[in-house]
């Protein structure tokens, strides 16, 4: 498989890549907002956390409407990890319109959502996306979930996978395969 860092202007390149190399599984992840990776902090120098989060959700929606050659959306609320105030400026309720549009687009396109445990690893206090988003995805009819650890080091492979099943069950998912 492969992870694509979704950027709407690269849609044709992604399609060509996937046609040439028909991977079994493709994660389409959002790493950029306003052309910057939130990891660098630059985007938060000019905009407040809530503005950046909203912008990220809007850009995510644009990307998934344009790019279809992926199976699962990764890093839905990754941006929160790097905000100046992180989760203080974030909740499903604050961004429900934008998040619901993303979730509905995924569901109607037959695409899934990644549960990324790295939010816990980085001290955010929750996995990505937030459990309230997972519950909403399920309420809207979403069924496809993958679990990832966002491991950039060998020791982080499978990080907190032992709690992923219970987390998913608490959000309304009945089946989980390890």
Give the positions of each predicted feature.
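Extended substrate/RNA-proximal surfaces in nucleic-acid metabolism proteins
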Residues: 1-108
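Charged catalytic cores and adjacent phosphate/nucleic-acid-binding surfaces used
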Residues: 34, 86-178
